[in-house]
From Swiss-Prot:
Pfam families assigned: CSN8_PSD8_EIF3K (PF10075)
Annotated source species: Homo sapiens
Protein name, as recorded: 26S proteasome non-ATPase regulatory subunit 8
Top-level taxonomic group: Eukaryota
The keyword Ubl conjugation belongs to this UniProt entry's keyword annotation: yes
InterPro entries with a match to the protein in the record: 26S_Psome_Rpn12 (IPR006746), CSN8_PSD8_EIF3K (IPR033464), PCI_dom (IPR000717)
């Protein structure tokens, strides 16, 4: 006899279990007559539990793969501190590889550039540009500074001026803002002097003096790396171009040659422009001396670059570039009339 309503639970002896597709299925007894209940199955819930379990294993395997890519054996739940330590350790290892290649007698510049590119990506994880909201350890700051210093020197060897300017803009933070927290770098004054020479070679005199004001007076007067560009700026203001050319012989470091050559080329162009205006013709040997060339071949190459033609008498002629006589005639009659009229008006005022 059945009672209307929910189907009663079947006795244990009447339950049946079946295994289909490796999943356990529990089947309820037939519903009671007139009952509105439906047989229920546990197959869906079992599937959901197994899916959740397999999904958790998949997520764990993904974490382990990501950790392996980052250089770790597995994943850890110790928090951001452990992650930062792992990144710092990886950056230190990559820096040692870069340093080893850079300190070779003839470093591979392409390989160094690739290492610098990878290191900058790693440094981004460490917030290598300090801000007010970040707290970096002394080890992290020194590591980032050393990498940027190699990058600045690498840019000089590659003759990449924009890259050098970017590296110096980043290094100034470590040289000035953190000078109390960090020990002084052995390359600080050399790179700051290079930056001054760079600004001078680009004729950015205002920025040159702005950077100079950030340095102590003692360094300006005594440090050999800073004194050199300061002396060059004084020679340029005096018009003593011969002293500028002589200064190339006593550069404080080999890296200064790159910007010195740019500065000397600019000065030569200015002198050559004045020669074209002031001389109708000039002797080959005299032009070589005025333009501070030490070999005739360099003078010949520069003359071809300027479009100068050497005549049979060993003279460079600039007659075609001189102003025409009518263009240089002084209107003396008109000037005299204006002066007389001006004097007459002064007498009327008195």
């Amino acid at each position: 006899m059945f009672i209307k309503g929910r189907a009663p639970r079947a006795p244990p002896r009447e339950r049946r279990r079946a295994t289909r597709g490796g999943l356990r299925q529990v089947v309820a007894p037939p519903r009671a007559l007139g009952s509105t209940s439906r047989p229920h199955f546990r197959r869906a819930s079992v599937c959901r539990r197994r899916c959740r379990k397999s999904g958790g294993l998949l997520a764990a395997s993904r974490k382990m793969a990501a950790a392996a890519v980052n250089g770790a054996a597995g994943f850890s739940s110790s928090g951001p501190a452990a992650t930062s330590g792992a990144v710092l350790q990886a950056a230190t290892g990559m820096y040692e590889q870069l340093k080893g290649e850079w300190n070779r007698k003839s470093p591979n510049l392409s390989k160094c550039g690739e290492e610098l590119g990878r290191l900058k990506l790693v440094l981004l994880e460490l917030n290598f540009l300090p801000t007010t909201g970040t707290k970096l350890t002394k080890q992290q700051l020194i590591l980032a500074r050393d990498i940027l210093e190699i990058g600045a020197q690498w840019s000089i060897l590659r003759k990449d001026i924009p890259s050098f300017e970017r590296y110096m803009a980043q290094l100034k933070c470590y040289y000035f803002d953190y000078k109390e927290q960090l020990p002084e770098s052995a390359y600080m004054h050399q790179l700051l002097g290079l930056n001054l020479l760079f600004l001078l070679s680009q004729n950015r005199v205002a920025e040159f003096h702005t950077e100079l004001e950030r340095l102590p007076a003692k360094d300006i007067q005594t440090n050999v790396y800073i004194k050199h560009p300061v002396s060059l700026e004084q020679y340029l203001m005096e018009g003593s171009y011969n002293k500028v050319f002589l200064a190339k012989g006593n550069i404080p470091a080999e890296s200064y040659t790159f910007f010195i050559d740019i500065l000397l080329d600019t000065i030569r162009d200015e002198i050559a422009g004045c020669i074209e205006k002031a001389y109708e013709k000039i002797l080959f040997t005299e032009a070589t001396r005025i333009l501070f060339f030490n070999t005739p071949k360099k003078m010949t190459d520069y003359a071809k670059k300027r479009g100068w033609v050497l005549g049979p008498n060993n003279y460079y002629s600039f007659a075609s570039q001189q102003q025409k006589p009518e263009d240089t005639t002084i209107p003396s009659t008109e000037l005299a009339k204006q002066v007389i009229e001006y004097a007459r008006q002064l007498e009327m005022i008195v």
